UniProtKB/Swiss-Prot annotation:
Functional summary from the UniProt entry: A scaffold on which IscS assembles Fe-S clusters. Exists as 2 interconverting forms, a structured (S) and disordered (D) form. The D-state is the preferred substrate for IscS. Converts to the S-state when an Fe-S cluster is assembled, which helps it dissociate from IscS to transfer the Fe-S to an acceptor. It is likely that Fe-S cluster coordination is flexible as the role of this complex is to build and then hand off Fe-S clusters.
Protein name per UniProt: Iron-sulfur cluster assembly scaffold protein IscU
Family: Belongs to the NifU family.
Gene Ontology CC: cytoplasm; cytosol; IscS-IscU complex
Gene: iscU
Coiled coil regions in record: none
GO terms classed as biological process: intracellular iron ion homeostasis; iron-sulfur cluster assembly; L-cysteine catabolic process
Assembly notes: Homodimer. Forms a heterotetramer with IscS; each subunit of the IscS dimer contacts an IscU monomer.
Pfam families: NifU_N
GO molecular function: 2 iron, 2 sulfur cluster binding; 4 iron, 4 sulfur cluster binding; copper ion binding; ferrous iron binding; identical protein binding; zinc ion binding
Organism ancestry: Bacteria, Pseudomonadati, Pseudomonadota, Gammaproteobacteria, Enterobacterales
Record CDD domains: IscU_like
Source organism: Escherichia coli (strain K12)
Gene3D superfamilies: 3.90.1010.10
Amino acid sequence: MAYSEKVIDHYENPRNVGSFDNNDENVGSGMVGAPACGDVMKLQIKVNDEGIIEDARFKTYGCGSAIASSSLVTEWVKGKSLDEAQAIKNTDIAEELELPPVKIHCSILAEDAIKAAIADYKSKREAK
């Protein structure tokens, strides 16, 4: 199986690796895993007062496709509203990275991580 140039680029030069303080009320965190392959993905978003994602970070333990999916998604969500970020689908990620069918689950993880981070952010805001 050969990886696409985009997967290789995001794997060798991942964007936005790291984490934010989870106690920050403007940060939403999503942690998801895939029992099928052991990949674990943590994705965090930082949202400004206007409801726009101003920054994103990730830490992923997994294959090149999982790391590339995380890296790509953190780039995509920056500058988007929560609704726009929520609308990102795994098929968009898989298509952009040209993932082979056996690696589609990596793009599903990335979509799930975005949704989990948004849900976490919203639950923090509602708790105020």
